[in-house]
Amino acid sequence: HLLDFRKMIRYTTGKEATTSYGAYGCHCGVGGRGAPKXAKFLSYKFSMKKAAAACFKYQFYPNNRCXG
């Protein structure tokens, strides 16, 4: 949940998530649409999608690689 994530950032860093990190990362416009701003983030986005796909294919039966 996005609000929980915001609270976690505030608790962990002491910073307001929206003003401190709102323009950071792969956010490329309203709704996250658009291409990543740097090659670093494009690579990161690909890695995250690959990891999510590896876990989601096992969502209906146990998989030791997916924790959390």
Curated annotation (Swiss-Prot):
Top-level division of the source organism's lineage: Eukaryota
Compartments (UniProt record): Secreted; Cell membrane; Mitochondrion outer membrane
TM segment ranges: none
Calcium listed as a keyword: yes
Binding annotation for Ca(2+): H27, G29, G31
Cofactor note: Binds 1 Ca(2+) ion per subunit.
Alphabetical list of InterPro entries matching this protein: PLipase_A2 (IPR001211), PLipase_A2_dom (IPR016090), PLipase_A2_dom_sf (IPR036444)
Enzyme class, spelled out: hydrolase
Catalytic activity: a 1,2-diacyl-sn-glycero-3-phosphoethanolamine + H2O = a 1-acyl-sn-glycero-3-phosphoethanolamine + a fatty acid + H(+); 1-hexadecanoyl-2-(9Z-octadecenoyl)-sn-glycero-3-phosphoethanolamine + H2O = 1-hexadecanoyl-sn-glycero-3-phosphoethanolamine + (9Z)-octadecenoate + H(+); 1-hexadecanoyl-2-(9Z,12Z-octadecadienoyl)-sn-glycero-3-phosphoethanolamine + H2O = 1-hexadecanoyl-sn-glycero-3-phosphoethanolamine + (9Z,12Z)-octadecadienoate + H(+); 1-acyl-2-(5Z,8Z,11Z,14Z)-eicosatetraenoyl-sn-glycero-3-phosphoethanolamine + H2O = a 1-acyl-sn-glycero-3-phosphoethanolamine + (5Z,8Z,11Z,14Z)-eicosatetraenoate + H(+)
Record-level GO cellular component terms: extracellular region; mitochondrial outer membrane; plasma membrane
Any one GO molecular-function label of the UniProt entry: calcium ion binding
Bilayer disposition of the protein: Peripheral membrane protein
pH dependence: Optimum pH is 8.5.
Protein name: Phospholipase A2, membrane associated
Organism: Oryctolagus cuniculus
